[in-house]
Amino acid sequence: MRILIVGAGAAGITAGHALSEKRIDFEILEASSVHGGRVKKTAGFADFPIDLGAEWVHRAIKAKAPTTQALLSGQSPEFRIFNYRPKTILQYKNGKLRSKRWMKLLLALVNDGKFADSTWFDFIDQLVTPEMKKKIHYSTPVIKIEHSSNEIVATSASGEQFRADKVLITVPIKMLQDEYIEFAPALPDWKKKAINKEQFGDGLKVFIEFSEKFYPDVVEIGSAIRNPLESDDSYYDATVGKNSSKNILALFAHGPTATKYTSLKTDKALLDFILKELDEVFDGQATRYYKKHIIQNWSKEPFIGGSYSMRKGSVKELSAPLNNKIYFAGEAMNPSGKTIAVHGACESAYLAVSEMLTNKDRR
């Protein structure tokens, strides 16, 4: 059996790892020049590595991928996780800063963690063995998948063709909604309906270094009472729990509230907007103490186009395989409903691989 994996994000890399363990032939076709997808890091901005993409370890999402079990249970010798417990949480609304003590209780209940001295990218990257890396074709965006015969043919933007018995699609759902990949024959109506019903929000992260710390551990702009899966914009001290001597404030925005940031035309316009917003909250101190910044605008990232899914569609239909030939995995495609989290994406890859090898069609 020969398998093609489209996408080298968390799900694609995990699927490759699972197939390697079973000694099954596969290739990974990755559109960008690097693997990781929405799992990305920068090591040179601060005195600790920074997650430019997925950052939190959402323990409340009980996805059980074999690769993440030791990590989630705190038994991984290579990757230390600490409990994320910010001490000062404020909300800025109608020109006033207010303490939000109840949010501390909520965060304790959610029990999120963060990497102490590494990142989600480091965790995914350690699965990419030298043998696997030889199987990854970088800068190879797939634009067409033909599946009318027993053999599947995937065609890249450059015209190169790859052949296999089965294909696993792990691209962000935004790419399927935009029909970046042509399927021949076309996807059935029920699959297209499920894909288009899902929402994929805008999203970005910005990290700013200041010469002085003038901000709390977390500050929410506007209403703090909303579904964080659907919309959020929060500034947070990125050094909480880290061994750092720097003053790094981060902005994470996703969903409808992120559009005011992601829609700005230039990075300068975005920085000016953020500093003005912070100056209003903190009496001009953001501009006064600004040193440098780094921006990761996921809405403008090629082959991604946003943050993550909003759980609006039918996950079971989204992830259901087609004719025992085309399979789906990723953070939006976990049939058990454990979506969004990186370990949810990893679990979806194991479930898809299992279905491939057993020819099980859930629909």
Where are these regions (language model features)?
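Beta1/beta-strand and adjacent pyrophosphate-binding region of the FAD-binding site
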Residues: 1-11
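A conserved short coil-to-beta-strand element within the FAD-binding core of flavoproteins
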Residues: 138-152
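Conserved flavin/dinucleotide-binding core of flavoenzymes
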Residues: 11-14, 21-22, 43-45, 90-106, ...
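Flavin (primarily FAD) binding-site architecture
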Residues: 169-187, 204-207
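Glycine-rich FAD pyrophosphate-binding loop
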Residues: 20-45
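Short beta-strand to alpha-helix junction loop
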Residues: 56-66, 107-128, 265-266
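N-terminal FAD cofactor-binding segment of flavoenzymes
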Residues: 46, 56-87
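Short hydrophobic core segments
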Residues: 5-6, 29, 162-176
